[in-house]
């Protein structure tokens, strides 16, 4: 992975630090990208690297993820992450020049980006990959139940590994990760683990904090859905295959489908940017060219 052309450490309200990295073409349209719960922005390199020749790509991790130091669990919640987002945008503009920002978010960061936009209109458009806003998969279980299940899984997850290779091998045995190329599973392990005290490796995002985010998710996603008509910028949602068992389904209301400019990738799961980076990059460019770069 290439070194960023610039890095700015953003000091947010409670003393936490967010490392924002700049890649790509500084003269191009500006993309601001973040990641899903428990993951890291560097993990999405197979996707955003395809946009780097044309776009000014600014990436950042959520607090307690990726490049950022761990924070106390009590400060780890969606309202605080929304405030972090706002501070990140302010720093990007002040350090690297003021120009329109196009948000590119996945999973939990889509909810944060949408909540950010409702509070303050910092984005000129939002490209959203597989946010869960109403029902999961075919609707056989509610979003609330799914969030609770994900929280339980996070708390039960193995937390210590001898090496990143051990985690990468375990990922290869899990069906949800089987659609990723082996090198992407390896990248996932490298970007989500850090050396542990006493040897071995542990997750950069503590499992308890990941679980807590899932528990916050439901309430905020419902709030976003109820305010869908408040958005006055172009929106694009690309979901996983609705039959995959974990996919964005905005509702059965055709007006909601139209508002989100909804599309999906057949045969892909929640991790579609990691499974089909080329298709996701093409859809990103197509959306921006159609709505804001024409």
Model regions and ranges:
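Alpha/beta-hydrolase fold catalytic core
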Residues: 1-34, 54-56, 93-97, 261, ...
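Active-site loop/oxyanion-hole signature of alpha/beta-hydrolase fold enzymes
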Residues: 13, 62-104, 282
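Catalytic histidine-centered segment of alpha/beta-hydrolase-like enzymes
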Residues: 268-277
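Flexible "cap/lid" loop of the alpha/beta hydrolase fold
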Residues: 126-164
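Conserved alpha/beta-hydrolase catalytic His-Asp/Glu region
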Residues: 158-213
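Conserved hydrolase catalytic core segment
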Residues: 98-141
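Conserved HGGG/HGGXW glycine-rich cap/lid loop of the alpha/beta-hydrolase fold
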Residues: 21-70
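Conserved serine/cysteine hydrolase catalytic core
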Residues: 194-255
């Amino acid at each position: 992975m290439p070194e960023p052309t610039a890095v700015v450490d953003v000091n947010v309200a409670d003393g936490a630090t967010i490392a924002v990295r700049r890649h790509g073409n500084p003269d191009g349209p500006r993309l601001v990208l973040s990641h899903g719960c428990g993951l890291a922005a560097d993990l999405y390199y197979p996707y955003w690297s395809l946009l780097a020749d044309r776009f000014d790509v600014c990436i950042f991790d959520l607090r307690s993820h990726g490049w950022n130091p761990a924070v106390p669990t009590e400060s780890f919640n969606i309202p605080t992450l929304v405030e972090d987002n706002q501070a990140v945008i302010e720093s990007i503009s002040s350090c690297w020049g003021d120009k329109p920002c196009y948000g590119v978010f996945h999973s939990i960061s889509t909810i944060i980006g949408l909540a950010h936009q409702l509070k303050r209109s910092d984005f000129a458009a939002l490209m959203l990959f597989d946010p869960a806003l109403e029902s999961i998969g075919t609707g056989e279980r509610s979003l609330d139940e799914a969030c609770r299940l994900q929280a339980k899984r996070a708390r039960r997850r193995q937390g210590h590994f001898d090496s990143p290779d051990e985690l990468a091998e375990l990922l290869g045995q899990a069906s949800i990760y089987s659609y990723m190329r082996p090198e992407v599973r390896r990248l996932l392990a490298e970007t989500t683990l850090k050396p542990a005290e006493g040897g071995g490796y542990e997750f950069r995002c503590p499992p308890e904090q990941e679980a807590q985010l899932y528990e916050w998710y439901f309430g905020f996603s419902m709030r976003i859905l109820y305010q869908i008509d408040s958005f006055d910028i172009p929106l694009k949602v690309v979901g996983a295959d609705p039959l995959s068992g974990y996919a964005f389904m905005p509702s059965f209301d055709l007006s909601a489908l139209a508002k989100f400019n909804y599309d999906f990738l057949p045969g892909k799961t929640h991790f579609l940017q990691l499974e089909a980076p080329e298709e996701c990059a093409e859809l990103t460019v197509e959306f921006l060219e159609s709505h804001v770069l024409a």
